Design a protein with these regions (language model features):
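Surface-exposed cleft-lining segments at the edges of enzyme active sites
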Residues: 1-8, 48-53
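Short, hydrophobic/amphipathic alpha-helical packing segments
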Residues: 4-15, 64
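Active-site beta-strand/loop signature of hydrolases that rely on acidic residues for catalysis
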Residues: 10, 14-43, 103, 126-127, ...
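Metal-dependent phosphoester-hydrolase catalytic domains
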Residues: 40-149, 157, 168-174
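N-terminal, intrinsically disordered, basic low-complexity segments enriched in Arg/Pro/Ser/Thr
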Residues: 160-161
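Short hydrophobic alpha-helical segments enriched in small aliphatic residues
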Residues: 164-165
Length: 174
């Protein structure tokens, strides 16, 4: 199955890029998006409605767990719902699924929520935004500038605002 192979490759990539502390490839990382996996039965409105369907299979759940084993932490809410099917009119009945997540490494999440109000708007996506605030201080970057035997020290802290933390975003991986 393509989805399972893709998630396995992603977990291996995350592990490979982790590096050792102090190495250049040991950078903070955020993976976020629609994983189309409900990691637990509590992440769907009625597990009996999903028996023998995608999103809740043991193989999918193991693939999601592989991302955690690769060194990522779920930083987004682990309860509530982030998706409601339009066709079945699930939103007004709060019959949803939690399938959208942010996973991180090397960052401290200071808060998170699912923006259900955004989902309630006319013409909104069937997914609600998953918002996570991170406490992130960018490392000081130093280097020398060539010229006349002088060295210039440069300092950059572009991520002083937690919303500027480096991210990788994922799309729909159904």
């Amino acid at each position: 199955d393509y989805k399972l192979r893709w998630l396995d490759a992603l977990a291996r990539h995350v592990e490979d890029q982790a590096g050792n502390p102090g190495q250049p490839n040991n950078q903070p990382l955020v993976l976020g998006g629609d994983f189309n996996i409900a990691p637990t039965d509590a992440n769907v409105w009625d597990i009996t409605a999903f028996i023998d369907h995608t999103h809740v299979t043991e193989a999918e759940r193991q693939a999601f767990a592989g991302l955690i084993e690769a060194g990522l932490t779920v930083t987004s809410p682990t309860s509530g719902y982030s998706y409601w099917d339009y066709k079945a009119g699930r939103f007004p009945k709060n019959e949803g699924m939690l399938i959208d997540f942010q996973l991180a490494r090397g960052l401290h999440a200071t808060g998170s929520f699912i923006d259900v109000a955004e989902r309630s708007g006319t013409g909104a996506s069937d997914h609600a935004p998953v918002v996570v605030d991170y406490d992130y201080d960018a490392p000081t970057i130093t280097g020398s500038v060539a010229g006349a035997g002088t060295a210039a020290r440069t300092t950059a802290n572009p991520a002083a605002d937690s919303h500027d933390a480096p991210t990788e975003t994922g799309g729909d991986i159904a």
